[in-house]
């Protein structure tokens, strides 16, 4: 059975104008230390920076933006800080295996984290026909940085780009499809959770169907009882 250990990233976070992809990775790094009962975490800047693969200064700047956009609360705690996470509805899951990968750079991880919610997920793959410019507008990362990440991910065999027969409405050129092998770079958890969610939904629907059948049977029994009572009165 594949590991379901993961960290959750709120879906709406990257849609906030002042938030940039590196902030998402910092959020994930802090959340990795979360106490699930209290929804608080106590990592030092050094620990957060180590998980991210960046400097403590970068971490501090990201924390300021996360606090300003109300996704994170920070309080002084002893010699360090205590972090509180705000409630959210939809989320993307990121495996600890993904966060710990040494063959992905800080920039590549933030890119993959930011764009995951815009992918079509199926068969351990994540697909999109968004161009670098279109994705740039969605995740607040420059097209040149996205293209650089794509080239690196192709070299690592984590990404394949193939031509499609779909035309871009603006340029008239044929679109390319980017296919990310999520399982290969540690994100199989997405599909484990997806299948788990599907199983829960199927059980829920099955229970609802059984309940409906039970209700129908009870109504029929009551009708028979009523009819029997009326027959006895006639006799």
Model feature map: region roles:
Residues 1-235:
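Electropositive, intrinsically flexible nucleic-acid-contacting patches
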